[in-house]
């Protein structure tokens, strides 16, 4: 499992594409919700529009995806000039909730979806405020075409296919953002630093090890003091705090996805005492491991 797979597992990412928009004429819609545990994205199938985020405007056209990792309030409109919101007519079309404005042939066709993840996940803390990418000339484009084809169907399992494709879409978006140097903070940024990469991957892959600063600094071929300083600058926390987060987020994933006992999970992620593990886990999640397991299985 590589680092991006590991981080998406720790974040417990779950994607869905649930809204299709067909807008005609002069229109504007607003999204006022803010949710640290949910990201939202807009995928332009046909046409063009404008999106305003924190007074900054973006021109979206066919093939664009606009991803807001923390679901920031924003508005979308047919032109660069903002107007009053226009109510949408809502109905259902196959898998999707259909939002319509206007009665003629749509000028804009757009899909909207969500990514859900654990709050305070290392992955989401590394994401920028937004990502605006045109997918037409990228390796992601065939995936988008496959999604558009699947979205027209109503076959058995289509929803599972569409939601699975949304998870793949997130990986491609993040991969593209990393390759284009659009990530400037957190774990994804730090992993691009050759000095820190080896130490970070060692922690991600083996959080159960009894890691010491000296060992990690040696892996990074840096002095102890320099390692701590650079680590803090890149990730915004100490190596010890980072290790604790990886252990606890690994434990949360196992509590949700496995039937292992709390003790077995504690040992697997690096705690030698179930009591100590439960105390640290509850301080972090405000729930005991057993309470957490029940809450995510509802």
UniProtKB/Swiss-Prot annotation:
HTH araC/xylS-type domain sequence ranges: 194-295
Alphabetized UniProt keyword annotations: DNA-binding, Transcription, Transcription regulation
Positions of the DNA-binding region: 214-235, 262-285
Protein name in UniProt: Uncharacterized HTH-type transcriptional regulator HI_1052
Pfam name, any one: HTH_18
Xref: InterPro entries: AraC_lig, Homeodomain-like_sf, HTH-like, HTH_AraC, HTH_AraC-typ_CS, RmlC-like_jellyroll, Tscrpt_reg_AraC-type_HTH
Organism per entry: Haemophilus influenzae (strain ATCC 51907 / DSM 11121 / KW20 / Rd)
Entry's Gene Ontology molecular function annotations: DNA-binding transcription factor activity; sequence-specific DNA binding
